[in-house]
């Protein structure tokens, strides 16, 4: 049972990786560009709010 499970998992992983790599090479550029733009806007807003809170706390503590 253990040998059969390990073998099946290794085969499924290899097939999944091969299919993913072939598709990712072609579609990865457009997807990463769209994702990076969306994530950058979200991260900038979150980072600015978080940084302001952090700096305000640090400034109050330091002063």
Swiss-Prot record:
Assigned protein family: Belongs to the protamine P1 family.
Cellular compartments per GO CC: nucleosome; nucleus
Region listing for Disordered, in residue ranges: 1-63
GO molecular function, one term: DNA binding
Superkingdom of origin organism: Eukaryota
Organism for this UniProt entry: Dasykaluta rosamondae
Any one of the GO BP annotations: chromosome condensation
UniProt keyword terms in alphabetical order: Chromosome, Developmental protein, Differentiation, DNA condensation, DNA-binding, Nucleosome core, Nucleus, Spermatogenesis
Transmembrane segments: none
Tissue: Testis.
Locations listed in the record: Nucleus; Chromosome
Keyword match Nucleus: yes
Designated name of the protein: Sperm protamine P1
InterPro entries xref list: Protamine_P1
